[in-house]
Regions:
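Internal glycine-rich, Lys/Arg-flanked active-site/core loops of soluble domains
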Residues: 1-69
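Conserved NAD+-utilizing ADP-ribose enzyme module
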Residues: 65-113
Length: 113
């Protein structure tokens, strides 16, 4: 799954929160997509290339395919449940071919999912 962010500067302490090996909980529903190009396009809509971000997310149990009820069915939209916990597999690094910073996350098993 993928999530593009055009400007991560509004996310407080981003590089500390998403440091490799850390665990982070996303507190609310989060919309992601199975379509990397759609997420990359969203991330690249940001004016400052150094602030463009692409999350690469390995989900296990918390994600549900909602493309069939989504207003944007062609986006292959998937919804991640609130309270999902992730481990940062690789912290922010620049990906020249994609023109974005990449952060890789994997879902941590929890008793809720």
């Amino acid at each position: 799954m993928y999530r593009g962010i055009p400007d991560f500067s509004a996310m407080p302490n981003f590089e500390e929160v998403y440091a490799q090996g850390r665990e982070v909980t996303w507190p609310s529903f989060s919309s992601v997509t199975a379509n990397i190009e759609e997420s990359r396009r969203l991330a690249c809509s940001g004016a400052d290339p150094s602030l463009r971000l692409l999350f690469v997310i390995r989900v296990k149990k918390s994600a549900r395919d909602i493309h069939y009820i989504s207003a944007f069915a062609s986006d292959s939209e998937v919804l991640i449940a609130p309270g999902t916990k992730f481990r940062v597999v690789s912290s922010m690094e620049w990906s020249e071919p994609e023109g974005v910073n990449r952060v890789e996350l994997e879902e941590v098993d929890t008793k809720f999912f």
